[in-house]
Regions:
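Carboxylate-rich, polar loop motifs that coordinate divalent cations or form catalytic acidic clusters
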Residues: 1-389
Length: 389
């Protein structure tokens, strides 16, 4: 794999020894698809992974795949899964292009929710309010309240400024009882159930507000918001959103996760994983060292923390990364990619009498490396592709 010095592995700038993450990686060889959209853990500890082509259940050892079977009404309604949610009763809900379903583990089957109209519904998000009600946002069909006992969805028409024709990508209830709704193409809507009033925060006050991608509250009660281009925190006293500074020219944020320890992660599409600093004033990159994927530039569509505080990162077009909370005893060394841009996989390893590591690296040649991981010299340079022809 390109630029991997698999001594233990390549990472960044100049054969530097760094502590590695204890990680696992799964791609399309194990998953139904590497286009990951959503992640959730059920009451039995299984990790569910939604993709653009099928649903996966992971028991810690192997994956079970779920697809749509037109001849089986209890199968997945459509192979494109967009949202997963575990409710307070331990029921797993699955939303996607084929509508809304919930999983019945005793039967290993899915039950489909019926909506008022017979045509299919594209479900974009699922959330459960503190009252126990389950709301789903759809693409072009409005917002629905779900009744599991009757297996039906009822369109909500009593929320001001909510249109049955709009696209709703995110719904979140904060600790103050306000319900925040991301309206694609419009902005952010805040609904107060106690007064039945709404307020719209348009694209004029939210950069990238035409796409609301994520919402969360941290342990201090700060309401955090991500859009298609940046991230904000809500100044409740002044009823305004303040942009969180970063050093990127463009930041396509996709979701927010507040970990059990209080770390505030921001997943981005092509800019890797960021962390919102404690003072809410700055975003910094979260450095994750992996031998098989460059997380710093990954297109992260989904991020999730399981019961054991392991971090699951869904990298679009690449696969699933699991970062354990337990560190590994191994270390990685990296090759300076600017000086050695053609460095590939390790082809040979040898330790000489002086304690130096002599390593053959495909595409560059033979390096002599100290026990501290510093390159002392290039013993042999590989001929260029032109010279080899």
């Amino acid at each position: 794999m390109k630029r991997l010095l698999l001594l233990m592995i390549v990472f960044f700038g100049g054969i530097v020894q760094v502590v590695a993450e204890n990680t696992l990686f799964y791609d399309s060889k194990q998953l139904t698809c590497d286009l990951i959209t959503s992640i959730c853990q059920d009451k039995d500890g299984f990790i569910w992974i939604g993709t653009d082509y099928g649903l996966n259940k992971f028991n810690g050892i192997q994956f079970t795949h779920y697809y749509n079977n037109p001849k089986d009404s209890t199968s997945l309604s459509d192979n494109s899964v967009k949202a997963l949610m575990l409710d307070n009763e331990g029921t797993l809900w699955v939303g996607g292009i084929g509508g809304l379903q919930y999983y019945v583990p005793e039967e290993n089957a899915f039950r489909t929710i019926k909506f008022e109209e017979s045509s299919s519904f594209h479900i974009m998000c699922i959330t459960q309010l503190r009252s126990g009600e389950i709301w789903v946002g759809s693409s072009g069909r409005g917002i629905f309240r779900i009744r599991k006992d009757t297996g039906t969805g009822e369109q909500m028409t009593d929320i001001p400024d909510v249109s049955e024709h709009a696209h709703y990508g995110v719904i979140y209830e904060d600790r103050h009882g306000s319900i925040w709704i991301g309206v694609n193409g419009t902005g952010l809507l805040r609904y107060d159930p106690s007064t039945r009033t709404s307020k719209i925060y348009t694209r004029a006050v939210l950069d990238g507000g035409s796409t609301i991608s994520g919402m969360a509250e941290d342990h201090s009660g700060n309401f955090l918001l991500s859009t298609g281009t940046t991230a904000y925190y809500y100044d409740r006293e002044n009823d305004r959103f303040t942009k969180i500074e970063h050093n990127e020219s463009w930041l396509p944020a996709r979701s927010i996760l507040v970990s059990q320890k209080g770390t505030r992660y921001l997943a981005t599409f092509g800019k890797g994983l960021k962390v919102i600093q404690p003072d809410l004033k700055e975003l910094r990159s979260e450095v994750i060292t992996l031998p098989f994927i460059d997380v710093d530039n990954a297109k992260i569509r989904a991020i999730y923390e399981d019961h054991n505080q392991n971090l699951w990162i869904g990298c679009y077009h690449r696969g699933m990364v699991m970062v354990s909370k337990e560190s590994t005893p191994f270390h990685f060394w990296s090759v300076p990619t600017r000086e050695y841009p053609q460095a590939g996989v390790i082809t040979a390893l040898y330790k000489d009498d002086d304690g130096h590591i002599v390593s053959g690296v495909e595409g560059e040649g033979v390096f002599k490396i100290t026990s501290e991981g510093n390159i002392t010299c290039l013993l042999y340079t590989s001929p260029s592709p032109r010279d080899r022809t």
